[in-house]
């Protein structure tokens, strides 16, 4: 069922965890490939050993007072919002020639994020309890995006079918229960929303 954080970020950060590639089968027997970190499922951005190092270092990321932090559940418009915020900070409505992935907490090593010049537009799909406390303590600007969960489910379904590393070829009616039960990447959508209330 539902998976939420039952531990504080300091408890999470003080325990080195391991990652593994898992397959979760839908009601029709079709499996989706993803990575699991202490029961928390994420997309397989990198091999598990690299993702494990990234995740173990997330609580130690140093935020800056001029950072803008875009937070959103998966498939909620993070990329578009990241582009718009980046354009606003650049003072120009021009295409950003770098990927939001280069500033995504759970996708790249801490050294890469640390090397981004200010002002940074960082982003993440992680639940609030898995984010560095410093993001809130430094009082950097946070942009929270919430999208109708019905739209998120449809978009995530097409994403899983379209991205080869997920290796998914199931039907939506079999996919939807996995979404509703929080068994997909970033676990439960409603838990994400409730944590931000």
Which residues are covered by each model-predicted region?
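PAPS-dependent sulfotransferase catalytic domain
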Residues: 9-197
